[in-house]
């Protein structure tokens, strides 16, 4: 079997410091110690593909167990919508959302899934999670 030629593309996404993402707001969870699961499904996620400059569309699903703070919904909507003009790879989207979410509300756990629309006959689903130790 012949080795496959590998090509490493030097494509730049929007630097983190230039993303201008809307801040995530929180409110106090009045029942700390009582574990509940909160699910969000954001069906209109859009970002820009750094390779093609075309829009990428996805459904972002997020499930978390709050600790002492909950995410405020309007700020979450504005945060997700603020990716609209960001050049970013699918894999990086989910990791950035995870990092920002954990930094904002310090949940007991969170699972995030990005279900990206088919592009070039390939469907991409990216998952990441966090568990407070």
Question: What annotation goes with each model-predicted range?
Answer:
Residues 1-133:
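N-terminal intrinsically disordered, cationic/polar leader segments
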